[in-house]
Amino acid sequence: MKYAWIEANRDSYSVTMMCEILSVSRSGLHDARGREPSLRTVDNTQIVKRIQRAQLKHRGRYGRRRMTPEVSEILGRPINHKRIGRLMRENDLSSRKRRRFRVVTTDSKHAHPVAPNVLERDFAARAPNQKWLADLTYVPTDEGWLYVALVLDLFARKIVGWAMSQTMPQELTLAALRVALGWRDPDPGLVHHSDRGSQYAANDYRDVLKARGITVSMSRKGDCWDNAPMESANGTVKVECVNDEHFKTRAEAERVIVEYIGYYNTERRHSALGYVSPAEFERRWRAAMNQAMKATSL
């Protein structure tokens, strides 16, 4: 009975401490484990199987935080995050690690006017198409760098615009913006925030924003924290889509990134959204809005 209690609470308390309090030896605990599988052991086996399936589905991208709601949802009951973490470590099911590349993508030495920081690190949005972030990132290939321009909707952390090129011309960021505008068709009043790079400060880019009634906001010089959620999204793309890949061509990299963006938007659980995907977060918001409208019409 004592051994079973220790096994049931090993994620919450130190095994050594529990053995001392209950006056049992660790060797006795090990012997008890070697007899017949306890209910806890059987349950752990089932949890590990679910973790393995989830890591296959998400290609090894999930760590303990995202794996916990994933497995809990599959099993239909809450599983302690410490238990998930321990089982992942013991079974070599940990997620991918971050690795950094160094390439300069912000050209702030230009003659274009720089907009003030209207956003002021207020990353909260009450609805879609209120606040967008934009930035450039890059992917190594055997042919050279592939530059990627992204546009992120802050409300659901959804990637709503993207474009790719072997160089960083103004047309690259403008193409990503046009994808976002075509897909989302935002009303006037949206705030568009980016760094102070020439691609975003250029007249053509700002003219498109002005024509749609979009307010321009730019980070302070050299302060990446002013665009932190966008920097985080770029880092996620690097870790989960690039780090463990070897792209021979830019075309290959572009295909994989486009596929990943679809996964990021529709399947990947996001920590800022209560660990649901951007698409699910927006779906729940729309359902709540529809329910509220029905209630007010009664």
Named regions from a protein language model:
Residues 1-298:
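Charged DNA-binding/catalytic regions of mobile-element recombinases
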